[in-house]
Amino acid sequence: MNGMNHSVVSEFVFMGLTNSREIQLLLFVFSLLFYFASMMGNLVIVFTVTMDAHLHSPMYFLLANLSIIDMAFCSITAPKMICDIFKKHKAISFRGCITQIFFSHALGGTEMVLLIAMAFDRYMAICKPLHYLTIMSPRMCLYFLATSSIIGLIHSLVQLVFVVDLPFCGPNIFDSFYCDLPRLLRLACTNTQELEFMVTVNSGLISVGSFVLLVISYIFILFTVWKHSSGGLAKALSTLSAHVTVVILFFGPLMFFYTWPSPTSHLDKYLAIFDAFITPFLNPVIYTFRNKDMKVAMRRLCSRLAHFTKIL
């Protein structure tokens, strides 16, 4: 393709979620509140883990990085959606659209691998506690973090390298509030069936494969605990429950999107809202309300801050 082809379309237009003024107002309030709550909740986790020495362990290091990814992920689409809700002309440049897609897939892929790392951390803590600190060393934690970032970048670049040179000569309308790869491919002025199949296989395989791997690891952990100590099964279930809930919230919409034969545009929008606002909001709620150490650390940090303000 020559470079002049895709320069015909300089921007893409979003249709948004609704044209009703009343529903737009509700969406604006809902989106703003959940985005603010998501950012604050995840910031609290990062701040608590950083400031409290009792939480300087592999588990909480990975959790803090998961919170950072969640903040970045919900910031890809949420701010623009909030700003565009009342606009009649909701547009994004070609470069802006590609950037949005790139970071969505890069951060999504990174989070998938990080969740696998967190499952491995729980396996070592529950099934091999004597070797936990030896294997889950600071170097290993950094290795997990670097590996997840590299895999996320590769996953995103592999798909976008074929997209940037596609010809886009119109139409330029997205029946959505954000840029996603399948819709972008359908707007290209050429046959993209093979590319669409490659994208679906790429994203579908990494989503379903990661989820299956996580489920197998959780089953293996529970089986190992049950085999050695029936009394420890309840404790293992309690420990894993937060991780399993987060995994289901993250992978559920993704797998539904990539395995459902023909999802409607309305369904796509609802799943996107869930990913952009609900999941990043629920993750810190799950990890704080279901984790005694985190709650104790937060209370301890609040006491220190209150004492510090009194001194001032």
UniProtKB/Swiss-Prot annotation:
CDD domains: 7tmA_OR4-like (cd15226). Glycans are attached at N5. Coiled coil: none annotated. Keywords: Cell membrane, Disulfide bond, G-protein coupled receptor, Glycoprotein, Membrane, Olfaction, Receptor, Sensory transduction, Transducer, Transmembrane, Transmembrane helix. GO terms for molecular function: G protein-coupled receptor activity; olfactory receptor activity. GO terms for cellular component: plasma membrane. InterPro entries: GPCR_Rhodpsn, GPCR_Rhodpsn_7TM, Olfact_rcpt, Olfactory_Receptors. Odorant receptor. This is Olfactory receptor 4F15. It comes from Homo sapiens. The lineage of its organism: Eukaryota, Metazoa, Chordata, Craniata, Vertebrata.
